[in-house]
Amino acid sequence: MEALGMIETRGLVALIEASDAMVKAARVKLVGVKQIGGGLCTAMVRGDVAACKAATDAGAAAAQRIGELVSVHVIPRPHGDLEEVFPISFKGDSNI
């Protein structure tokens, strides 16, 4: 199973900038975006652990330049049950 990288921002523009930076910085796939409320937005990427770490680092830096970065986290091996509850499944070709 691949790692899961997440970035949460306050504001959609910062999240879009962070998402763009993440997919450009490493071989990751953007698998979800969620607007939570109160201006909070989260983007999720999947890839190997190193790629998710590089992507979230780049995304965090980009978000901080544009708006407010709230949180960044990488789960190296998310449990399979998470995919049944949260929209984090990697669906697509294997050469991301």
From Swiss-Prot:
Species per Swiss-Prot/TrEMBL record: Salmonella typhimurium (strain LT2 / SGSC1412 / ATCC 700720)
Family label: Belongs to the bacterial microcompartments protein family.
Documented effect of changing R65A: Still interacts with EutQ
Functional summary from the UniProt entry: Probably a major component of the bacterial microcompartment (BMC) shell dedicated to ethanolamine degradation. Each homohexamer has a central pore with an opening of up to 8.6 Angstroms. A positively-charged funnel leads to the pore from each side of the hexamer. The pore probably allows metabolite passage into and out of the BMC. Expression of eutK, eutL, eutM, eutN, eutS (eutSMNLK) in E.coli leads to formation of a single BMC. Expression alone leads to thick filaments that interfere with cell separation.
Protein name: Bacterial microcompartment shell protein EutM
Pathway where this protein functions: Amine and polyamine degradation; ethanolamine degradation
UniProt subcellular location: Bacterial microcompartment
SMART domains: BMC
Misc: The need for a bacterial microcompartment in EA metabolism can be bypassed by increasing the levels of EAL and an acetaldehyde dehydrogenase (not necessarily EutE).
Effect of Q64 to A/D: Still interacts with EutQ
Effect recorded for Q64K: No longer interacts with EutQ
Organism phylogeny: Bacteria, Pseudomonadati, Pseudomonadota, Gammaproteobacteria, Enterobacterales
Uses in biotechnology: Artificial BMCs can be made in E.coli by expressing eutK, eutL, eutM, eutN, eutS (eutSMNLK) or eutS alone. Cargo proteins can be targeted to them and beta-galactosidase (lacZ) was active within the BMC, showing the BMC allows passage of substrate into the interior. This can lead to the development of tailored BMCs for specific metabolic reactions. The addition of eutQ to the eutSMNLK construct results in biogenesis of multiple BMCs. Can incorporate into the pdu BMC where it alters growth, suggesting fine-tuning metabolite flux by using different BMC components is possible. Can be used as a self-assembling protein scaffold for synthetic biology. Overexpressed, purified protein with a SpyCatcher tag added to the C-terminus yields self-assembling fibrils that are stable at pH 5-9 and up to 50 degrees Celsius. Addition of SpyTagged cargo proteins leads to isopeptide bond formation between the scaffold and cargo proteins, colocalizing and stabilizing the cargo proteins and reducing the time for the reaction to make maximimal product.
Induction: Part of the 17-gene eut operon transcribed from a single promoter, induced by ethanolamine and adenosylcobalamin (AdoCbl, vitamin B12).
